[in-house]
Amino acid sequence: MIRKEVEEAPWWITETGVIISKKLKKPRKTFITPHGYEMIGYTHPKKGTQNYLVHRLVAKYFIYDIPKGMFVNHIDGNKLNNHVRNLEIVTPKENTLHAMKIGLMSGQPGESNSMSKLTNMEATNLIYDLIAGMNNVEAGEKYSLHPRYVSLIRHKRRWKTLWDRIERSTTIA
């Protein structure tokens, strides 16, 4: 088993993510974060308590130093599989696309999307206004939106799920 010295604390780390105490020559206990990642703490004499994500330590010592703003991705989606063969350094966008591809994350619809400009109720009212004949400029003024964004809603490029729900509920069978 290959192990490397960790500069942040008196430990060795293996390619599987096991942290070994240099003093006791035994594996150190780790804990699981609320987000499901394995973490280890160390109380530094001068810096105080420091916590480290195990997968980031494995990546740093067995792949290469992680550039600022980059993520360490678990290839199989298992946050506790910290083996170096299961890790890769990726951009935030690549990390999100990977999570969506393997089913760990889906695009958030409606107001739960962090980029949403409207609440579900506002979007519903806007769609009903568009159905009733309101133009993009009027709707933009009423809802404080750019007319181009209103156009995206009108043509179902935004809020499509809500459009579909409204159309299903208003059609006569």
Swiss-Prot record:
**What keywords would UniProt list here?**
Endonuclease, Hydrolase, Intron homing, Nuclease
Identify which top EC class this enzyme belongs to: hydrolase
SS bond partners:
none
Q: Does the keyword NAD apply?
A: no
User: What does the record give as the function of this protein?
Assistant: A possible homing endonuclease, it is entirely encoded within the YosP intron.
GO MF terms here are: endonuclease activity
Gene3D superfamilies, sorted: 3.90.75.20
- Signal: present as a keyword of the record? no
The record's listing under Pfam families reads: HNH_3
The biological processes this protein is annotated with in GO are: intron homing
- State the SMART domains in the record: HNHc (SM00507)
Its name, as the record gives it, is SPbeta prophage-derived putative HNH homing endonuclease YosQ
According to its UniProt record, the EC number is: 3.1.-.-
